[in-house]
Amino acid sequence: MSVEQAPVQRADFDQVMVPNYSPAAFIPVRGEGSRVWDQSGRELIDFAGGIAVNALGHCHPALVKALTEQANTLWHVSNVFTNEPALRLAHKLVDATFADRAFFCNSGAESNEAAFKLARRVAHDRFGPQKHEIIATVNSFHGRTLFTVSVGGQPKYSDGFGPKITGISHVPYNDLEALKAQISDKTCAVVIEPIQGESGVVPADKAYLEGARKLCDEHNALLIFDEVQTGVGRTGSLYAYQHYGVIPDILTSAKSLGGGFPIGAMLTTTELAKHLAVGTHGTTYGGNPLGCAVACAVLDVVNTPETLAGIKAKHERFKTRLEQIGQQYNLFSQVRGVGLLLGCVLTEAWKGKAKDVLNAAEKEGVMVLQAGPDVVRFAPSLVVEDADIDEGLDRFERAVATLTKG
């Protein structure tokens, strides 16, 4: 029996939702590939990807098939039992990475929460309670739980909620000397995003990551890579650590892993995983059959030589055109990033106006993101068609031309 749904509009958000978001004026109602349609039937090209989540675009046939088949089979059993999709997904991830063990949850924040708890637990078990300090970077972003905002180096997200988690310090990103000065035998973990996504799409220097690995080894600290945004093909490698050739002790993954379905994962070694014994950590929904079935399908499509090579080629297509647009209209001083995570840094004349660029782009029918007030971010589908790239950037250029005319 179908139930007729009451019509809703954007204005309803302001009446019934907690106001912690400020969504766009239009409501997307349908998506296919890299295209989205709103309530009025207007079509937009999606270069935002649900903030680097929709790895295969909208309603990819392989994901629809995986979700539909699993939805007709088994939804949820809790972690009192395991399930087949979770075990298949764990095998796929450990076979493709440095890791031996996987922990599944529902989001990037939960993945990082698990990683930070594991790091402290390992240090506690091996060295005692005095070894509990975590070093993160300024302007990092690791999630919105109290622990993850405390580790994240952005006061705008962590201030105003009472005492933060203690034992956490922050050093400038890509500054190995600052890390060297801060790390000590009390450090249990160093947490790094291989590319700082929310803070401007800033890639790490290879020497910085190599140096961090060496310092962690010298001080018996664990190296955690937060790959929530960079993982699952986003950089043209399955995970960014493979792009850099630096192996962490713990890796976190989410966003693209589910291709739009909520799932997170923490990956680590057998030796470290044993410290999370029965009862030390958990999540009711983590590793549910639906999410794991979809994630298996995502990996089957993304983790192929053809798809990963295509991401690198599409990077060049985006970057070349964005640099041309930036130069022609004096809008971007730099286009940076790896794979299909690109950040366009606004010139001095346009500093602080990333949201204006987003709004102008939306009016021309293209969805993009910002990464702070000074950077326009692109995180499209990893399998976006070249024709969609070209048409989307044509629309984006029209938006820029209109905006810069004033």
Curated annotation (Swiss-Prot):
Give the matching NCBIfam families. arg_catab_astC, argD, PRK01278.1, PRK05093.1, PRK12381.1
Q: Which InterPro entries match?
A: Ac/SucOrn_transaminase_bac (IPR017652), AcOrn/SuccOrn_fam (IPR004636), Aminotrans_3 (IPR005814), Aminotrans_3_PPA_site (IPR049704), Class-III_PLP-dep_AT (IPR050103), PyrdxlP-dep_Trfase (IPR015424), PyrdxlP-dep_Trfase_major (IPR015421), PyrdxlP-dep_Trfase_small (IPR015422)
Q: Which residues get modified to N6-(pyridoxal phosphate)lysine?
A: K255
For this UniProt record, the keywords arranged alphabetically read as follows: Amino-acid biosynthesis, Aminotransferase, Arginine biosynthesis, Cytoplasm, Pyridoxal phosphate, Transferase
**Quaternary structure per UniProt?**
Homodimer.
Q: In which pathway does it act?
A: Amino-acid biosynthesis; L-arginine biosynthesis; N(2)-acetyl-L-ornithine from L-glutamate: step 4/4
- Gene name per UniProt: argD
The protein's superkingdom reads: Bacteria
Q: What else is known?
A: May also have succinyldiaminopimelate aminotransferase activity, thus carrying out the corresponding step in lysine biosynthesis.
PROSITE patterns from the xrefs? AA_TRANSFER_CLASS_3 (PS00600)
Name of the featured protein:
Acetylornithine aminotransferase
Provide the binding site for pyridoxal 5'-phosphate. G108, A109, F141, D226, E227, V228, Q229, T284
Enzyme Commission code: 2.6.1.11
Q: How many cofactor units bind, and how?
A: Binds 1 pyridoxal phosphate per subunit.
Recorded family membership: Belongs to the class-III pyridoxal-phosphate-dependent aminotransferase family. ArgD subfamily.
